Amino acid sequence: MSTITLERPPLAGCILRVARPTDQMEAVVDFYRDGLGFPELTRFTDHDGFDGVILGFPGAPYHLEFTSARGHLAGRAPTQDNLLVVYMPDARAWSRMIGVMARRGHRPVPSFNPYWDREGVTFEDPDGYRVVLHQGLWPV
């Protein structure tokens, strides 16, 4: 039996920031900004010991933040299954994006989970985190 709730959940309509550290700020920014096309929204230096770059589309309810802290080693992704998944319903736009990534020197890698290879292409950023460009709509 399901329950119908008329009240809006507290997180509905909120903005999501995915934040993580990096030891390779400019290489990571190049991957996401110049490769994947996320515009640079802002950059900060020595904010309580942190430097960072925030990427995203103006007005979008999500953005990416990359930070570095003096004296802190961020290291690489803990597994090959740390993913951002981008669902791209337009097949031509998806093909163009794959071409842009190739021209920027980013080569596809086999996905740890073979599900993502069936309708998508996976790229690994300089820190070992992965982005899946999935060709299709999100089914939910």
How would you describe each model-predicted region?
Residues 59-64, 127-131:
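Short, charged/polar, Gly/Pro-enriched secondary-structure boundary elements
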Residues 36-38, 57-59, 69, 101-106, ...:
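A generic structural signal for ordered secondary structure
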Residues 46-47, 69-70, 90-91, 114-116:
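Short beta->alpha connector loops
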Residues 1-11, 14-23, 43, 53-58, 74-140:
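Vicinal oxygen chelate
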Residues 67-72, 136-138:
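Acetyl-CoA-dependent GNAT
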Residues 12, 20-63:
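Core segments of cupin and vicinal oxygen chelate
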